[in-house]
Each structure stands twice: as structure tokens, then as C-alpha cells.
Amino acid sequence: MKIKFLGTGSGQTSLKRSHSSILISSSKFNLLVDCGDGISRAFLNQKIDFQSIDFILISHFHADHFTGLPALLTQMKLVSKKTNLTIFVHISEKNFLEQFLFHSYLFKERMTFEVKIISFETESEIKMDNSFFFIARRNSHLDKYKQYDPDKRLGFVSLSFFFRDDENSVIYTGDIASEKDLYLFDQKVEWFISESTHIEPQYFADILTKLNPDKLILTHISDENKGSLLSFQQNMSKSLKSRIFFASDGFDLKHCDTGCL
């Protein structure tokens, strides 16, 4: 498994970072996790082929995590992509996504490739092939908004993920809201990827000791919180400091050997 960070910014637009997107590659497919605003430009900047994406997985429907999707599909059409594209989304959001793409004038009949939208439930093991699967669990990132939807029209689903193949295992928190959301999965993994905007830095040291991942990679970094993250790292013990990395756009996890904030 290889992981490339296409977008490592927060919800606040930055000239230095694109919005959230992670590319997970195996020997058989490419999976894009989230596709925030500006993802198509991020593809060009990092020389990613629009035709190379086989699957897209959406963690939640905040704008910085999904609004780049229509533009990305448009670029795929313009380069005459032929291979199928499957978009994975929580079951509560499937109808919305179908309507969103329809209202973006992305009609299936006019695409050069087949677009499938597949819904899934939390806790289900979703197999991408014989050696790769993911499990999604719901976190509390969107819970604070429930008071604004008395008619319960929205699902308020924000997901964290566990990925595994024959070589590697990964936890990706997605956007979260509390320390508890860091522990939705308790598996020992090589790579623990966490957002860093909605959680205090001191909790990351606990992750390194309690869950003991080989590497902790922080993303979803705003221009404002970069300094506090660096200060946090500088105050860590040498043994822990060597295991924490700050992702920047283009960060290749498979070959990382130094922090690159």
C-alpha cells in the first residue's frame, strides 16, 4: 500500500495547501479518500492521471471534503476516461450525492465511463479486492449541528476508517470532534493518520503510547495552527518525536523519513 497526500489543508482555504484528499494505491487500484474543493488542480500539481482513479470514498459532506467531486468527474470526462469509477458513500448520503451530481449536469448517459455510487453501513467490512478492505465507524464531528435540523433531514454522518491490505494497516480519523474519536479503532497499525484542526495537540502523544502506531501522520493543517504543532513536536521526547510526521501536499507516506510540515 502506498499513500500520497494530495490535500492537507483545513477548511480554511490556503495558498500553501489544497483541501482534504488522500490517494491510497495498491498494485491493483487507486482509491481517493475525500476530494475537497480544488482537487482537480491538486491532480495537475502532483501529476496524477485523471484516468487512474478507480474508487472514491467520502468521509463526510463538509465542503472541504467533497465539493471537488463534480469538477473531478468533469475532468475525467474531458480526458475520455474509459474505466469504471465507483464512489463509496454512507447509506444515509447516497440519495443526496446522486442528486448533487445530477444538479451538476453530470448525466450518466453522457459520461465516457460508468459511475457507480455504492452505499455502505458502518461496521461493515467493505472489500475492494481479495487483499484490501476498509471498515468505517461513525465519529462525533457533526453531532453539534443536529440542533439545527429539527426535521431530521440530514444524517450527520462523519466517518473514521480502518484500511488493511496484505502489507499495511492504516487508521484515518477523518474530521473528528473529541479525544474519544481518536480511539474508535484499537488495532495496532503501521500508519495512524489524524486530522489536527479539531483536536488539541497533546492528545497525539497519548496515541503514540496507547495505540503504538509505527508512524503518526498529522494532516488537515491550517496556516494558523502550524506553529502550535511544531511547538508540540519540539517538546516531545526524542523517541516519540521520531515517529510523528506533518503531512504537506505531495507527502508520500511509503517513502517518508522526515517530517515535512
Language-model features: locations:
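DG-centered beta-turn motif at the end of beta-strands
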Residues: 173-175
